[in-house]
Amino acid sequence: FIFKRMERFFLIASLAILSSCQLTSLIPADIYEEPEPIVTVKPDVAYKSVWERIALNSRSQNQTLDNETLKYINSYLSNPELFNRLLVKGEYFIFFVLEQLENYDLPAELALLPYIESNYDPFSISSSGAMGLWQFMPATARIYGLQDTWWYEQRHDPLISTKAAVRYLAYLHNRFGKNLNYTLSAYNGGPTLLEKQIKLNRKMGKPEDYKSLKLPRQTKEYVPKFKAIVELIVNSEKYNIQLPKFPNQAVLGEVILDGQIEIFAFSEFADLKPEFVYKLNAGFTKWASPPSKTTSFNVPIELVDRLNEKKNEFTQVNQINWVTHKVSTGDSLWKIAEKFDTEVSALKRVNYLRSDLLNLNQELL
């Protein structure tokens, strides 16, 4: 039992892929008025794929390709196999991202932004502490209500973090006059810095386009990187690129189970590899979902009906309940183990403790 717990811990740790992408965005506490989703009747267009939907609704179709953008285009084209492997990583999330962007009337090509941010990897963690598909920094995540608990990190959750990121992008897009280059620069470098540099150039009578602003090198490179991948997707035939087959339809569904559920038990129930379950539900940071009345799992949509038919039978024998104990004065591992009728060695393994020392207010399972 304990070794299974440790096995799960090491699996989760191995899935946390370090990314070089960094996000230094920080919006002021006195956030500007946030845009509301737009209720519109979507045109009844039968797109052949997600790629076609992005291309036909892109607002960058006739963009000017400067030398920096061409440099990144050539870099992608120099290794078509690597570029294809990059695109495949968005398979389970890009349709959902596109739907959310359309809800706020944002440019469809922003669905490609996670390729720049995180390689569409929900486990991605930068050296600066940014996390998830959208590389949220802690301060920005808090403003947009993303929770971080012992059990759950919503910056890693691909769907919840996407909803927050789209709200943030809508805010930036409105704040900077729906200028896409400004929106991208603000997302990467922070809106306060961008606004300051725009005002400074205006005061000095200098051009105000993003290339003329004094911005960090990373932010300067961010826009052409994005423009390059947009160009290759929107004009894939021109560059002889075979795009992965992503249908223009939802590929993820939701299964809601009663109580707290172990991830490995659910993976066996769904007949999915644990690594895949964690990928679709990357917000779960431990071997089980958070203690709650219900647990929601993202799964391939074709499995939803089958799992819903059998979920009551599954939860009757697989529901778990963990008790959390907060360390108080006078506590020791021996006393806590005696109180909960368990062993000190079990407590240490489950809580990843290397010694018998405890900290005041430390939470133990």
Model regions: which residues?
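Sec-dependent N-terminal signal peptides
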Residues: 9-18
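An acidic, Gly/Ser/Thr/Pro-rich helix-cap/linker signature
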Residues: 19-105, 110
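Second-shell loop/turn segments in exported
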Residues: 73-87, 97-99, 121-131, 147-159, ...
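Short, functionally critical alpha-helical segments immediately adjacent to catalytic or ligand/cofactor-binding
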Residues: 106-123, 183-188, 277-281, 350-351, ...
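Secretory-pathway/luminal and periplasmic proteins that interact with or process carbohydrate-rich
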Residues: 119-127, 142-144, 172-175, 191-204, ...
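Substrate-binding/active-site groove segments that recognize
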Residues: 128-150, 162-169, 194-197
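Primarily a LysM-type cell-wall glycan-binding module
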Residues: 244-274, 317-341, 354, 359-363
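Extracellular LysM carbohydrate-binding repeats and other cell-envelope/extracellular binding modules
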Residues: 280-313, 343-365
